[in-house]
């Protein structure tokens, strides 16, 4: 279907000569694939060598679209196959499913309590990067998404003839415009564009898949280990390097890191606001028919005290009222975030009517869920609110945690300049590794500040210092959960880690005296011989 419509679009837009050329190349390629004929391959190469540049461009464009459509068709076929297997298997779990894995573990002697203990210590963090292999524009990806939806409707819906024709017309429209759409951008995207692109690419899928994944695990555990209480913690989260990986990329600065985190936060907050509004529409239980528990009553009362002029106090639907109050706090949090100007070294008093930590939102949602379950509303208590709780556990208030990465050489050069400028040490870079370790160990045990509040160093050194100060400011004023990992690339010695600890101490991220660290340092040993 897709190939036929694609061919018709080429025939209409580029003409019969172009269409025949593309079909000839396609058929010759298929023959080579089926026969592995070296002679046919040489004939094809000879044919391509004789084609003019403008026609080669047309060929490249045609086959680019063709392979995108072919990949889409293969994805649809795989989904169709999986759905068919699940329908035919009835109670039998699918191969490689969560349930199948748990059955295999049970049959090998693993007990439910062992699964419980494993889950409590599990921590799975898929990390997104701005991978150069995905250079397609958002416009192209949107067209493919639209085509996938159309194919789903043709496959799974019972359609009237007029509805089927409408879908076929929509497919033809998308492919016709796809053929004349630029597949890649004209200019290189900025870092913040890459952040936005990843959000646009994965956000819609993740917020649908994650709750389903949590439900699949819960269902499988209950079925495979009946009667055993196995708590499912938040063992899954997502990370990103985009906006945090500054190793070799001068465009990733402390300002870009701040902007990337803010964009991720704003995105997930807006999504939560939409979901809470939807939830309030579902939970329309009237107090004429139910009596809310004391914990919910107290929670509503506490929230009302945060909004003295609130006019929602007369609503006689307690769960909806609580959702409205959550909505207000989320919107206040979003406003606070948008107007926030980070200020390192200056104490900031956080507003009381915002969410700062994700557990605050989780507590509010759990109050509603627990009350629903205690009143016998098991479907509502285990329905949409449970999915939202799952999302908050996974994405918290930052969508993706951001890993900061910098090359070890940048830290060493910056520290050497600071030590010389402050009259502490003239020749830090000339010290051997053992001497550096001794010096840095002594420095970390001193209470004095090494770096003044006002920076007077080179641009590169100031950027290193500002990165750590930005991390500290974000943890204190914006989001305490988003930044936890600092990656040192090209690590070859232990002193590389101590250099980072010095900068972390100076920013307020680490202290030996007070026994705390707000970051986990991750050395990369790719430079070791």
Predicted segments with their positions:
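Often metal-dependent polyanion-binding catalytic scaffolds in large enzymes
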Residues: 1-442, 460-463, 484
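Conserved alpha/beta-domain cores
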Residues: 184, 229, 244, 252-254, ...
């Amino acid at each position: 279907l897709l190939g036929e419509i694609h061919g018709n679009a080429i025939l209409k837009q580029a003409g019969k000569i172009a269409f025949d050329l593309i079909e000839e190349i396609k058929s010759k390629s298929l023959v080579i694939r089926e026969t592995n004929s070296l002679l046919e391959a040489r004939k094809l190469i000879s044919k391509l060598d004789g084609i003019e540049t403008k026609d080669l461009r047309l060929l490249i464009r045609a086959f680019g679209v063709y392979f995108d459509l072919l990949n889409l068709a293969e994805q649809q076929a795989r989904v169709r196959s999986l759905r068919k297997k699940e329908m035919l298997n009835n109670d039998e779990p699918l191969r490689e499913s969560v349930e199948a894995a748990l059955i295999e573990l049970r049959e090998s002697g693993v007990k439910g309590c062992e699964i419980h203990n494993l889950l409590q210590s599990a921590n799975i963090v898929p990390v997104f990067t701005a991978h150069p292999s995905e250079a397609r524009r958002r416009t192209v990806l949107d067209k493919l998404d639209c085509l996938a939806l159309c194919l789903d409707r043709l496959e799974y819906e019972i359609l009237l003839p007029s509805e089927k024709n409408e879908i076929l017309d929509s497919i033809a429209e998308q492919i016709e415009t796809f053929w004349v759409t630029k597949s890649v951008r004209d200019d290189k995207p900025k870092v913040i564009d890459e952040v936005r692109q990843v959000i646009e690419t994965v956000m819609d899928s993740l917020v649908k898949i994650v709750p389903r994944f949590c439900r699949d695990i819960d269902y499988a555990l209950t079925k495979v280990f009946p009667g055993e209480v196995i708590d499912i913690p938040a063992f899954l989260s997502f990370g990103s390097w985009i906006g945090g990986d500054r190793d070799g990329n001068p465009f990733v600065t402390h300002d870009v890191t701040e902007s990337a985190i803010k964009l991720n936060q704003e995105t997930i907050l807006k999504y939560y606001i939409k979901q809470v509004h939807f939830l309030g529409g579902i939970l329309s239980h009237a107090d004429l028919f139910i009596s809310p528990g004391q914990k919910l009553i107290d929670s509503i009362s506490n929230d009302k005290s945060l909004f003295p002029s609130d006019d929602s106090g007369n609503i006689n639907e307690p769960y909806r009222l609580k959702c409205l109050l959550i909505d207000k706090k989320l919107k206040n949090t979003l406003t606070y975030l948008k107007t926030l100007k980070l200020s390192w070294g200056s104490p900031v008093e956080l507003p009381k009517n915002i969410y700062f930590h994700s557990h605050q939102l989780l507590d509010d949602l759990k109050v509603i869920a627990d009350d629903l379950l205690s009143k016998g509303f098991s479907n509502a208590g285990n329905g949409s609110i449970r999915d939202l709780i799952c999302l908050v556990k996974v994405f918290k208030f930052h969508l993706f945690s951001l890993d900061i990465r910098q090359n070890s050489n940048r830290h060493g050069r910056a520290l050497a300049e600071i030590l010389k400028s402050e009259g502490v040490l003239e020749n830090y870079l000339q010290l051997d590794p053992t001497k550096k370790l001794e010096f840095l160990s002594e420095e970390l045990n001193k209470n004095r500040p090494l770096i003044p509040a006002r920076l007077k160093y080179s641009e590169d050194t100031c950027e290193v210092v500002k990165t750590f100060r930005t991390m500290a400011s974000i943890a204190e004023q914006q989001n305490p959960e988003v930044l936890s990992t600092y990656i040192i690339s090209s690590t070859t010695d232990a002193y590389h880690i101590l250099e980072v600890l010095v900068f972390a101490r100076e920013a307020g991220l680490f202290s030996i005296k007070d026994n705390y660290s707000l970051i986990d340092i991750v050395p990369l040993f790719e430079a070791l011989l």
